[in-house]
């Protein structure tokens, strides 16, 4: 349970980091959420 939760949180952080890098490169907030 804890192991699975750890991997899930790691994947979420990794995905969020990639999203922030892409959003930062756009620089104009063109992504609509």
Curated annotation (Swiss-Prot):
Keywords: Electron transport, Membrane, Photosynthesis, Thylakoid, Transmembrane, Transmembrane helix, Transport. The keyword Ribosomal protein does not apply. It is a single-pass membrane protein. Belongs to the PetN family. GO terms for biological process: cytochrome complex assembly; photosynthesis. Disulfide bonds: none annotated. The 4 large subunits of the cytochrome b6-f complex are cytochrome b6, subunit IV (17 kDa polypeptide, PetD), cytochrome f and the Rieske protein, while the 4 small subunits are PetG, PetL, PetM and PetN. The complex functions as a dimer. It is found in: Cellular thylakoid membrane. The gene is petN. The chain crosses the membrane at residues 2-22. GO terms for molecular function: electron transporter, transferring electrons within cytochrome b6/f complex of photosystem II activity. This is Cytochrome b6-f complex subunit 8. SUPFAM superfamilies: PetN subunit of the cytochrome b6f complex. It comes from the Bacteria. It holds the Pfam family PetN. One of its GO terms (cellular component) is cytochrome b6f complex. Component of the cytochrome b6-f complex, which mediates electron transfer between photosystem II (PSII) and photosystem I (PSI), cyclic electron flow around PSI, and state transitions.
């Amino acid at each position: 349970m804890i192991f699975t939760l750890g991997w899930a949180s790691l994947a979420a952080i990794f995905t969020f980091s990639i999203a922030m890098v892409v959003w930062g490169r756009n620089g104009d907030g063109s992504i609509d959420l």
